[in-house]
UniProtKB/Swiss-Prot annotation:
GO biological process: regulation of apoptotic process; regulation of cell cycle; regulation of centrosome cycle; regulation of RNA splicing; regulation of transcription by RNA polymerase II
Expression tissues: Widely expressed (at protein level).
Species this protein is from: Mus musculus
Modified-residue entries (Phosphoserine), positions: 341, 344, 358, 361, 380, 451
Family stated for the protein in its record: Belongs to the cyclin family. Cyclin L subfamily.
InterPro entries: Cyclin-like_dom, Cyclin-like_sf, Cyclin/Ssn8, Cyclin_C-dom, Cyclin_N
The protein's name: Cyclin-L1
Binding partners and assembly: Interacts with POLR2A via its hyperphosphorylated C-terminal domain (CTD). Interacts with CDK11A, CDK11B, CDK12 and CDK13. May form a ternary complex with CDK11B and casein kinase II (CKII). Interacts with pre-mRNA-splicing factors, including at least SRSF1, SRSF2 and SRSF7/SLU7.
Residue ranges, annotated region (Cyclin-like 2): 209-293
Cross-link Glycyl lysine isopeptide (Lys-Gly) (interchain with G-Cter in SUMO2), sequence positions: 345, 353, 368
Length: 532
């Protein structure tokens, strides 16, 4: 629709615009938006801004679909073939006609509903929109346009009754449940959608009155059979798309032409009578062929059409999900990057070859072989460095266990202010126990290295050096390190070697008593420091 600024300043300006537009003649014709505008500019027009306007005329008599929108239609773009779409159009128009009769609507309202139905599905697809819901919306909207409104409840009840008759079931009233409420909301939304898609241009110019007027010009209005037959052809042509392709005057001439040929009533041919009404013979023949083709088609099968539409709908949904990278259930699909998708491989072997080994069994074997490799590495003569490191680790753990046993013996003693002899005897006993434990913790292969006298000497020196450090440091180191490393192993070994350790304990106690006098001063000084 073309429009321009409308002068509203003064009445004189409006009069000048009307005077300047007297030489302009509006053009008749249709456009895709349903409006026709004619604008003529003269030298005596009205200047508004930088433009000169003479007249703006708006007509909404009729709207036609342009040729480029007739094929392919939105339904054909969604995968629906042309015969199925034609059957759906015919079935929808038949539903509107039958519902209009049951609703006692005038024929003009039923014709308006069918034209709106055709217009809507030239902009939308049958796959995405239910034709039955759209048919309800179109007849409800047409009843309002033709000033014969009906309630939505009545429209839904009539379509429910027609559905039962089509399925050859016993008619039963519609239950007012949630399904009814959902259907009602769908009809209301579909009506709004029709208005939006048509740009609120829902005016339809019907050829009913034009047929009567043309027959009066031809002096055939008294022939009721001719009038009724032409009227019937016009109602049948509403199921085709001729009402969105041709002007109503051309359709009226084609209906009169068909009725006269069927009843063998002669009409003027020199010149042809339809030239008087501005119609060509090619257009009349095209409308007649399209209308007569309607009678050669089989009755559309509702169930097959529903299955076809549902099939196309599922295919469309699959294509959309595939474009988004999703499966049918909404879960994300596996990516084909890296060749991990089974679809990328032409064929996968069903049986695993004997030469190929499972990675799980290889991992298990490597785990089992690890301790054997460690034992072989410790026994080999080339790993002397590892043996020395192991010895140093065992000596460190022995010293830490000594400090731990000593701290435990002190913490467990109930009295700290005993005389020096009792404290010394307690420390010596704890030392002997720690020595025996440390010797039992060390591996058996290290027992032949050194005499017990040298080991006792080393342990006393380690004890003196450990006494010089802080008491808090001993506790933290002994608790954090000795517990985690070898406490579990020590408890297991003590359970199996109790008899052997008892003999060693007696030997260490006798050795202790013999050397008691030599180290009497050092131990006293150490205990004195701790008491301070």
């Amino acid at each position: 629709m073309a429009s321009g600024p409308h002068p509203t300043s003064t009445a004189a300006a409006a009069a000048a615009a009307a005077a300047s537009a007297s030489s302009a003649a509006p053009s008749a014709g249709g456009s895709s938006s349903g409006t026709t505008t004619t604008t003529t500019t003269t030298t005596g027009g009205i200047l508004i801004g930088d433009r000169l306007y003479s007249e703006v005329s708006l007509t909404i008599d009729h709207s036609l679909i342009p040729e480029e929108r007739l094929s392919p239609t939105p339904s054909m773009q969604d995968g629906l073939d042309l015969p199925s779409e034609t059957d759906l159009r015919i079935l929808g128009c038949e539903l509107i006609q039958a519902a209009g009769i049951l609703l006692r609507l005038p024929q003009v309202a039923m014709a308006t509903g069918q034209v709106l139905f055709h217009r809507f599905f030239y902009s939308k697809s049958f796959v995405k929109h239910s034709f039955e819901i759209v048919a309800m919306a179109c007849i409800n909207l047409a009843s309002k346009i033709e000033e014969a409104p009906r309630r939505i409840r009545d429209v839904i009840n009539v379509f429910h009754h027609l559905r039962q008759l089509r399925g050859k079931r016993t008619p039963s009233p519609l239950i007012l449940d949630q399904n009814y409420i959902n259907t009602k909301n769908q009809v209301i939304k579909a009506e709004r959608r029709v208005l939006k898609e048509l740009g609120f241009c829902v005016h339809v110019k019907h050829p009913h009155k034009i047929i009567v007027m043309y027959l009066q010009v031809l002096e055939c209005e008294r022939n009721q059979t001719l009038v009724q037959t032409a009227w019937n052809y016009m109602n049948d042509s509403l199921r085709t798309n001729v009402f969105v392709r041709f002007q109503p005057e051309t359709i009226a001439c084609a209906c009169i032409y068909l009725a006269a040929r069927a009843l063998q009533i002669p009409l003027p041919t020199r010149p042809h009578w339809f030239l008087l009404f501005g119609t060509t013979e090619e257009e009349i023949q095209e409308i007649c062929i399209e209308t007569l083709r309607l009678y050669t088609r089989k009755k559309p099968n509702y169930e097959l059409l529903e299955k076809e539409v549902e099939k196309r709908k599922v295919a469309l949904q699959e294509a959309k999900l595939k474009a988004k990278g999703l499966n049918l259930d909404g879960t994300p699909a596996l990516s084909t990057l890296g060749g991990f998708s089974p679809a990328s491989k032409p064929s996968s072997p069903r049986e695993v070859k004997a030469e190929e080994k499972s990675p799980v069994s290889i991992n298990v074997k490597t785990v089992k072989k690890e301790p054997e490799d460690r034992q072989q590495a410790s026994k080999s003569p080339y790993n002397g460095v590892r043996k020395d490191s192991k010895r140093s680790r065992t000596s460190r753990s022995a010293s830490r266990s000594r400090s731990r046993t000593r701290s435990r013996s002190r913490s467990h003693s109930p009295r700290r202010h005993y005389n020096n002899r009792r404290s010394r005897s307690g420390t010596y006993s704890s030392r002997s126990r720690s020595r025996s434990r440390s010797h039992s913790e060390s591996p058996r292969r290290h027992h032949n290295h050194g005499s017990p006298h040298l080991k006792a000497k080393h342990t006393r020196e380690d004890l003196k050096s450990s006494n010089r450090h802080g008491h808090k440091r001993k506790k933290s180191r002994s608790r954090s390190q000795s517990k985690t490393r070898d406490h579990s192993d020590v408890t297991k070994k003590h359970r199996h070697e109790r008899g052997h350790h008892r003999d060693r304990r007696e030997r260490s106690r006798s050795f202790e008593r013999s050397h008691k006098g030599k180290h009497h001063g050092g131990s006293r000084s150490g205990h004195g420091r701790h008491r301070r």
